[in-house]
From Swiss-Prot:
Its main location: mitochondrion. This is Cytochrome b-c1 complex subunit Rieske, mitochondrial. Its EC number is 7.1.1.8. Residues 141-274 are mitochondrial intermembrane. [2Fe-2S] cluster binds at residues 217, 219, 236, 239, 241. Disulfide bonds join 222-238. One of its GO terms (biological process) is mitochondrial respiratory chain complex III assembly. InterPro entries: bc1_Rieske_TM_sf (IPR037008), Globular_prot_asu/bsu (IPR011070), Rieske_2Fe-2S (IPR017941), Rieske_2Fe-2S_sf (IPR036922), Rieske_Fe-S_prot (IPR014349), Rieske_Fe-S_prot_C (IPR005805), Rieske_TM (IPR004192), Ubiquinol_cyt_c_Rdtase_Fe-S-su (IPR006317). It comes from Gorilla gorilla gorilla (Western lowland gorilla). Proteolytic processing is necessary for the correct insertion of UQCRFS1 in the complex III dimer. Several fragments are generated during UQCRFS1 insertion, most probably due to the endogenous matrix-processing peptidase (MPP) activity of the 2 core protein subunits UQCRC1/QCR1 and UQCRC2/QCR2, which are homologous to the 2 mitochondrial-processing peptidase (MPP) subunits beta-MPP and alpha-MPP respectively. The action of the protease is also necessary for the clearance of the UQCRFS1 fragments.
Length: 274
């Protein structure tokens, strides 16, 4: 085949391109060698990575646009003329608009104005809070109909001399006693040293002939019986407490005298309790 390709003349390249070789039985005398690949470069581990040469690529190579330091004033880059630098002059006071002047000269006036605004605000808030608290507390107070029942008018001409009448006042029994002249003199002559809860008769009445008491025993809250007991005043049937005609404890376990409510004589024939 090779000889035919060599004799073909101008067709030799075509014939040689389409030819193929057939392996013979003879072994080659020289072994074929494979070309060696180039070796990879070995890094020098002894060379420090953070060196001037290794960091030179990260260094700034252009002019600085801003710098800040202890002795270096801050600078602004005006490379873009369409960017407006923030100006807070509208929010600053007139005394501190000039940056070349010291603010200590106007500090007293500025502090005084701040204190004035704070004080006025505090007073306003306190006044509003006072009104709110007053309305809240008044909403929990008794209504007008309840306050009307808090006072009771008693016509004294309906109570004969030497008698005791009971009324209901604020859910409690109220005793109104029309004393005789003998009872008045008897209670006024009692020595205070004989009393467990010392109190003179004149200190418990506004008019000697009228005694107004709350009919609740000071021991355990029972209702005493009028015109009874060893002293002719009131007697508690629960535990045997004896009161005189002035409502003072004279005998028994009760520790205190009968309570005297607040009352006022509006006329000779009318008294208002409460």
């Amino acid at each position: 085949m090779l000889s035919v390709a060599a004799r073909s003349g101008p067709f030799a390249p075509v014939l040689s391109a389409t030819s193929r070789g057939v392996a013979g039985a003879l072994r080659p005398l020289v072994q074929a060698t494979v070309p060696a690949t180039p070796e990879q470069p070995v890094l020098d581990l002894k060379r420090p990575f953070l060196s001037r040469e290794s960091l030179s690529g990260q260094a700034v190579r252009r002019p600085l646009v801003a710098s800040v330091g202890l002795n270096v004033p801050a600078s602004v880059c005006y490379s873009h003329t369409d960017i407006k630098v923030p100006d807070f002059s509208e929010y600053r006071r007139l005394e501190v608009l000039d940056s070349t002047k010291s603010s200590r000269e106007s500090s007293e006036a500025r502090k005084g104005f701040s204190y004035l605004v704070t004080g006025v605000t505090t007073v306003g808030v306190a006044y509003a809070a006072k009104n709110a608290v007053t309305q809240f507390v008044s909403s929990m107070s008794a209504s007008a109909d309840v306050l009307a029942l808090a006072k009771i008018e008693i016509k004294l001409s309906d109570i004969p001399e030497g008698k005791n009448m009971a009324f209901k006042w604020r859910g409690k029994p109220l005793f109104v006693r029309h004393r005789t002249q003998k009872e008045i003199e008897q209670e006024a002559a009692v020595e205070l040293s004989q009393l467990r809860d010392p109190q003179h008769d004149l200190d418990r009445v506004k008019k000697p002939e009228w005694v107004i008491l709350i009919g609740v025993c000071t021991h355990l809250g029972c209702v005493p019986i009028a015109n009874a007991g060893d002293f002719g005043g009131y007697y508690c049937p629960c535990h045997g407490s004896h009161y005189d005609a002035s409502g003072r404890i004279r005998l028994g376990p009760a520790p205190l005298n009968l309570e005297v409510p607040t009352y006022e004589f509006t006329s000779d024939d009318m008294v208002i309790v409460g």
